């Protein structure tokens, strides 16, 4: 990656991360936040401006992680990628369209109230199409990428904030033929 953006037109590293990935096993993000109004503020901007930049504050890294390269591959390949959002007990999902690692140059009309440009940002996610879901559906339908066992996500959601890489839990295959 040579720029501070991950978009469909970026050159993709050959082999490795994300090669041959199907949408059913795609990598997604789950963001848990303590600000109970964050989703509503961002959803309102997305409805007005078509999409919204969702910031994740923290120290910026010099090189993309393996998982960021997977997300880059997915976006470039047109794989539907989701960001799941938990604030309190409310749960939503939105389509991920772009990742930016430098907030300079993003459209300020697509930033929600409360964005603090003085705080370090390790990434902004361009989100579109907010849908409501349930916490139960997320806990039962997603697994951590780092430990893909059913129910393993529940422990990771105990804190007030988290950025988790998740995948959809594959339904059990058909039973033996009779």
List each language-model region with its residue ranges:
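Compositionally biased, charged N-terminal/linker segments
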Residues: 1-78, 140-141, 146, 150-178
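Hydrophobic beta-strand residues in large extracellular and virion-surface proteins
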Residues: 29-31, 83, 125-127
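A residue-identity detector for tryptophan
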Residues: 53-54, 82, 122
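Short, isolated positions within intrinsically disordered regulatory regions of eukaryotic proteins
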Residues: 57-58, 86, 126
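Short conserved beta-strand and strand-loop elements enriched in small hydrophobics
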Residues: 79-87
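Aromatic- and Lys/Arg-enriched surface recognition patch
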Residues: 89-177
